[in-house]
């Protein structure tokens, strides 16, 4: 419970007490490691994870160990551990996801795509793998491939807002503004409080020539949420039909002003 609530220090203390009674308590080791990583003390998580990995034939422990090793700058060791875990059969899919992410962070996104494709070949029905592969294609600037994979994921899980927003983003980046707008509307119908999707929908509307509707949508995003000013101003600036302001105060002044109404004769 403490770990889920992100009360990392409480979780660390509870796990430590459990390990005093039973040093081989696998669940306590996992909780302790996650808590230490959450506290920014990843280096302290490595030794208990290494000991647990030697005692247990456990891919979850091995994957977290690989993550921790990469997190403290021991990236070659971490990737080697993750490759070893990914080679297990039956496959442990989170190891592929972690391995692909770490390799992508090293700059070899093409290799990361290959790892995700390998994982998907082992578990073709996994929607989560399809989503991760689509995201990886976007990082590799392969927008068409991303849209193809994410469209398949949407067909398999039409109610997943994370898939819908990623597919919409791929369409937006690919210049398919009408498709992106429709997909963002679908996602917002399922999760109306997604402010980032509302801002991106506004960009789509402006690109489609609906500048007034787009700016109205951005005003709605900003209203009562001053912390969203940077994102809203960026949305206006990145649109080819948007507006650019040199000062945040100028953007705020424009967005806080209601648009003038045209008098009807």
List the predicted regions and their residue ranges.
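TPR/TPR-like alpha-solenoid helical repeat scaffolds
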Residues: 103, 202-208, 229-246
């Amino acid at each position: 419970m403490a770990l889920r609530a992100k009360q990392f220090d409480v979780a660390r203390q509870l796990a430590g007490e459990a390990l005093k009674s039973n040093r081989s308590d696998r669940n306590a080791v996992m909780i302790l490691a996650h808590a230490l990583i959450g506290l920014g003390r990843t280096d302290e998580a490595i030794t208990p994870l290494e000991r647990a990995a030697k005692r247990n034939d456990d891919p979850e422990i091995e994957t977290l160990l690989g993550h921790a090793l990469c997190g403290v700058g021991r990236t070659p060791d971490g990737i080697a551990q993750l490759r070893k875990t990914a080679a297990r059969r039956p496959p442990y899919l989170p190891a592929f996801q972690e391995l692909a992410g770490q390799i992508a962070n090293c700059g070899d996104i093409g290799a990361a795509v290959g790892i995700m494709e390998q994982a998907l070949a082992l578990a073709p029905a996994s929607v989560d793998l399809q989503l991760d592969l689509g995201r990886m294609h976007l990082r590799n600037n392969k927008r068409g491939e991303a849209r193809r994979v994410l469209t398949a994921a949407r067909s398999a899980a039409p109610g997943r807002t994370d898939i819908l927003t990623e597919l919409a983003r791929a369409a937006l980046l690919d210049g398919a503004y009408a498709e992106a707008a429709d997909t963002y509307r679908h996602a917002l119908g399922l999760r109306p409080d997604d402010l980032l999707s509302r801002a991106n929908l506004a960009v789509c509307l402006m690109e489609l020539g609906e500048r007034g509707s787009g700016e109205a949508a951005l005003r709605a995003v900003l209203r009562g949420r001053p912390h969203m000013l940077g994102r809203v101003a960026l949305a206006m600036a990145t649109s080819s039909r948007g507006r650019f302001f040199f000062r945040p105060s100028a953007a705020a002044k424009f967005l806080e002003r209601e648009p003038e109404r045209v008098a009807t004769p």
